[in-house]
């Protein structure tokens, strides 16, 4: 590991920290761009041929959305303009950055070109600031909240339907991201972002690590964990979001879409989970791994729910 790679990795991490510790829109935007530039520069330095095309596509989309966000953010946060047009465009660009329906078109093409480490950075670290901005936008009207809610639940269902027709692991992770973006969107407006992001982030990181290591037993269990199947901890995260959303006027629609997306998603998660499980050699270690994985998931999930 070279000094350059360490510095660029630090940029990826320090960008979100800078944004979330400032109340100035320009500083928030600069932090957002620091992490993006650090990510792109790092993988150009590493010369990842396979992921080069995906990263450039990601960079173009993020650059366009960031430019539009900067201009609209100046009107909203600096000039305190209350125009619905500026607010609508700003939220639209946030959804493009995150990859939420109907602006999810780039997720699967980009994910299919990225390594598992890249997917973790794009799906978690570079998503922190846009989600944080969405959660702390005090100028959002009730109409905009209802719109975000509807798009979130649609993203949940649409991502689940896309995943049914995919057969490659990276593409399935992309479809899963679209679904979880819907859950993250709902957690932002319900004030439960921290708990859901922690459970989702932990489940995704564990899966990506085991995919990199090629541990089939652990991959199988990690897929079930990412699906939100009880008693895994992501189930606790989803229940917490639904309980918070029960206070809104659209609670029935949220509940119906959430159940539908969860059931549909579970089908393709189970398909891949069973595939990895059946290809694994039968030995006593798998029972030990299963017990330990379940224990950690259930314990962590319950502790988070009780906090």
Swiss-Prot record:
It is an enzyme of class 7 (translocase). It is a multi-pass membrane protein. GO terms for cellular component: mitochondrial inner membrane. It is found in: Mitochondrion inner membrane. GO terms for molecular function: NADH dehydrogenase (ubiquinone) activity. The keyword Electron transport applies. Its main location: mitochondrion. InterPro entries: Complex_I_Subunit_2, ND/Mrp_TM. One of its GO terms (biological process) is mitochondrial electron transport, NADH to ubiquinone. Its EC number is 7.1.1.2. Keywords: Electron transport, Membrane, Mitochondrion, Mitochondrion inner membrane, NAD, Respiratory chain, Translocase, Transmembrane, Transmembrane helix, Transport, Ubiquinone. The keyword Electron transport applies. It comes from the Eukaryota. Signal peptide: none annotated. It catalyses: a ubiquinone + NADH + 5 H(+)(in) = a ubiquinol + NAD(+) + 4 H(+)(out). The chain crosses the membrane at residues 1-21, 25-45, 58-78, 88-108, 119-139, 144-164, 193-213, 217-237, 250-270, 287-307. Belongs to the complex I subunit 2 family. Core subunit of the mitochondrial membrane respiratory chain NADH dehydrogenase (Complex I) that is believed to belong to the minimal assembly required for catalysis. Complex I functions in the transfer of electrons from NADH to the respiratory chain. The immediate electron acceptor for the enzyme is believed to be ubiquinone. This is NADH-ubiquinone oxidoreductase chain 2. It comes from Albinaria caerulea. The gene is ND2.
